[in-house]
Amino acid sequence: GTVGTGAIDPLREIAAICRENRLWFHVDGAYGAPAAALPDAPADLRALSLADSVAIDPHKWLYAPLEAGCILVRNAAALPDTFAYTPTYYAFDEGGEDPPANYYALGFQNSRGFRALKVWMGLRQAGREGYVRMIEDDCRLARALADRIAAHGELELLTHSLSIVTFRYAPPRLRTGRAEDDATLDAINEDLLQQLKAGGEAFLSNARVDGKFALRACIVNFRTELADVEAVPEIVARLGRVRKGANAANGVSRK
């Protein structure tokens, strides 16, 4: 998988290989793991339950304030077995029926802020159903954006997975597959992305898809509305036309 496109690896097949070879199966679910809670989650994503450990960034698709990262481990004893140590300057009483959690025994980091509070508050406020509804809305908006891009004559839809859509400004006459035209499209879209960042009309990032420079929309904000995504294709097309015209004036674009 890759965060660039939201692609998901064949987790069930990987889990079988790990079990057969007694390997630890870790999944980087920093962005996409929360979508496993959706009723129509992809089968590969549902296989997340087979992992020995999963990394999640709640500041991404659980809408927590930056920054908040965590790891979920199937066998909690594996962490202190790996990281715990007792230097002479530590004197904690770890006995009793309910010993305190000493986080230095659970990972490399010792001193740390109370990141868990904001995640806990979000879970208490929204609950499972609330998060499912918000994530479903994000995926619905991404589908709407992908449909509009696919129907737009000047844009090329490259990928759509979960709430991530990658595409590029690509007028048909430049979609030849020739190296020089691909280079022209890359240059147009790289410049277009900088214009978007400077103008503030929409915030997109970038990815590489089959070697092509792509614009990347990742919807992970519960405040995003349909009107926001409906505006993106024409904003991109308008800026692309201006950039293409500048290229033509300079003799860059092919006829």
Residue ranges and their predicted role:
Residues G1-N21:
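Active-site core of PLP-dependent enzymes with the aminotransferase class I/II
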Residues T2, N21, H26, R46-H152:
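Active-site C-terminal subdomain of aminotransferase-like
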Residues T2, Y31-A33, K60, N221:
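Active-site-proximal loop/turn and secondary-structure-junction residues that shape catalytic pockets
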Residues G6-P10, A35-D40, P65-A68, F83-A84:
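Short acidic, glycine/serine/threonine-rich loops at helix termini
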Residues A15-H26, A78-P80, H152-L155, L239-A248, ...:
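Secondary-structure transition/capping motifs at alpha-helix termini
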Residues E156-S161, L204-R208:
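Short beta-strand
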Residues L157-L196:
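Conserved PLP-binding catalytic core of the aspartate aminotransferase-like
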Residues R178, N206-K255:
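PLP-dependent enzyme catalytic core of the Aspartate aminotransferase-like
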